[in-house]
Curated annotation (Swiss-Prot):
UniProt GO molecular function: protein tyrosine phosphatase activity
Keywords for this protein: Hydrolase, Protein phosphatase
Superkingdom of origin: Eukaryota
Record's catalysed reaction(s): O-phospho-L-tyrosyl-[protein] + H2O = L-tyrosyl-[protein] + phosphate
Annotated source species: Styela plicata
Gene that specifies this protein: STY-4
Name recorded for this polypeptide: Tyrosine-protein phosphatase 4
Length: 109
């Protein structure tokens, strides 16, 4: 798939329990078998982070690469619901813009 958008709605750890493994580098490159994930940039807002990665398949002789944007939402409390839905609406708007700019491929959630 040529998904260019990832939406992550959980933290790595919540209430002392691991919820998600960090599959992205904070800097440089992480390698998973033939797949390389290279950190490009991060934009932090109050309730979510936008990270850009370059994903490459080292076994592909054509040098295929994909720029992927991850939207990591931090505004959802561990228990209950957010006080305001405004930041979630902002997140959805930013994801929609990304989708339009990247070819409207499936979103990984």
């Amino acid at each position: 798939s040529k998904s260019a958008s990832i939406v992550m709605l959980t933290e790595l750890v919540e209430r002392g329990q691991a919820k998600c493994a960090q599959y992205w580098p904070n800097d440089g490159i992480l390698t998973f078998g033939d797949i390389e994930v290279e950190f490009l940039s991060v934009n932090e807002s109050e309730d979510y982070s936008e990270r850009d990665f370059k994903v490459s398949n080292r076994s592909d002789n054509n040098g295929s690469q994909l720029i992927v944007k991850q939207f990591h939402y931090h505004g959802w409390p561990e228990v209950g619901a957010p006080v305001s839905g405004y930041s979630m609406i902002e997140l959805v708007e930013d994801v929609q813009k990304q989708q339009q700019n990247s070819g409207n491929h499936p979103i990984v959630i």
